[in-house]
Structure formats: structure tokens, C-alpha cells
């Protein structure tokens, strides 16, 4: 039974990849940061992987640190390649919101992160996370740009649909 109408997935729209050539700069940097962060969770488990997750109070720290590392490696690579970019951005967005909530909002409490209290301490601590969050929202909204595998897939899907 074929899916028709509004229930049918719109792959050409999901893969749509136009926009200025400069989008590649954002996509490559966002993908590279997530890929490198994911790899580092396995290279330095005490500082960035399960050890860090335990220190901030995450239950089942090894499981969640490994899951986080795999998500960052896989989705970071997809973003880097411009392949299923919008799909890959969603788990990374969830990852960043979780990182901000679990590690940065504590700075709003007295004596919080870096011993700096209040909003400015949190803003300082969260600057990289917020920048990555903004980059992911941009890619989710605009797509991966002209120089991406999504664009090639989109052209192919559009050509197949025109037949």
C-alpha cells in the first residue's frame, strides 16, 4: 500500500540544499566540532567521557557517555558530509540542550560554575554550547548548502519524481 498525500515523506524537501556557498563554512565547523568531541569522549574517558558524566551526576554514566560519543561521531560525520544534515541535526540539538541544562544552568546557582555567580557566569560557560546550538538551528532551517551530498540526493529524488 503506497503512502499518498500529506502522509507521504517529502524527501526532496527534507534534502533541499540551496543557499549561499558560505553555508559550507558553518556546516564544516559544526560537523568537525561534534566529530572531534565524540572521538575525545573515547580517547579521554576520565576527563570527557564516563568520568565527566559521573562527576556531573548523570546516572549510568558509562552508557550515556558512550551513547553521546557515538551520536556525536555519527551525526557530526553526517553534518560534515552534508548527508541527511537536517536529520543528523536533531539528535545533536537534543545533545546540546541536554549539555546546557545539565552543566551550564548550574552556574545560575550561587557559587556555581567557575565560582562565578549568576547569569554572566552561565553565559560565559555556555558560549560554545550556545554557538553550536545556533549553528545546528541554522542548518536545520537552511539545510547544508550547495556543496553537500544532500543536494545531489535531492536532485536525484526530484529527477526520479519527474519521471
From Swiss-Prot:
It is found in: Cell membrane. Its main location: membrane. Keywords: Cell membrane, Membrane, Transmembrane, Transmembrane helix. It is a multi-pass membrane protein. One of its GO terms (cellular component) is plasma membrane. The chain crosses the membrane at residues 19-39, 63-83, 87-107, 119-139. Signal peptide: none annotated. InterPro entries: DoxX (IPR032808), DoxX-like_oxidoreductase (IPR051907). It comes from the Bacteria. Pfam families: DoxX (PF07681). Belongs to the DoxX family. PANTHER family: INNER MEMBRANE PROTEIN YPHA-RELATED (PTHR33452:SF1), OXIDOREDUCTASE CATD-RELATED (PTHR33452). This is Uncharacterized membrane protein Rv3486. It comes from Mycobacterium tuberculosis (strain ATCC 25618 / H37Rv). The lineage of its organism: Bacteria, Bacillati, Actinomycetota, Actinomycetes, Mycobacteriales.
Amino acid at each position: 500500500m503506497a503512502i499518498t498525500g500529506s502522509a507521504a515523506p517529502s524527501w526532496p524537501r527534507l534534502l533541499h540544499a540551496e543557499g549561499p556557498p558560505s553555508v559550507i563554512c558553518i556546516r564544516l565547523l559544526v560537523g568537525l566540532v561534534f566529530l572531534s568531541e565524540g572521538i575525545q569522549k573515547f580517547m579521554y574517558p576520565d576527563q570527557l567521557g564516563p568520568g565527566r558524566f559521573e562527576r556531573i551526576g548523570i546516572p549510568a554514566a558509562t552508557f550515556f557517555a558512550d551513547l553521546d560519543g557515538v551520536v556525536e561521531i555519527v551525526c557530526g560525520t553526517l553534518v560534515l558530509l552534508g548527508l541527511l544534515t537536517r536529520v543528523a541535526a536533531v539528535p545533536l540539538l537534543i545533545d546540546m540542550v541536554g549539555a546546557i541544562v545539565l552543566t551550564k544552568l548550574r552556574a545560575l546557582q550561587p557559587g556555581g560554575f567557575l565560582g562565578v555567580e549568576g547569569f554572566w557566569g552561565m553565559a560565559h560557560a555556555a558560549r560554545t554550547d550556545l554557538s553550536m546550538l545556533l549553528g545546528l538551528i541554522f542548518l536545520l532551517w537552511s539545510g547544508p548548502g550547495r556543496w553537500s551530498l544532500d543536494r545531489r540526493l535531492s536532485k536525484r529524488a526530484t529527477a526520479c519524481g519527474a519521471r
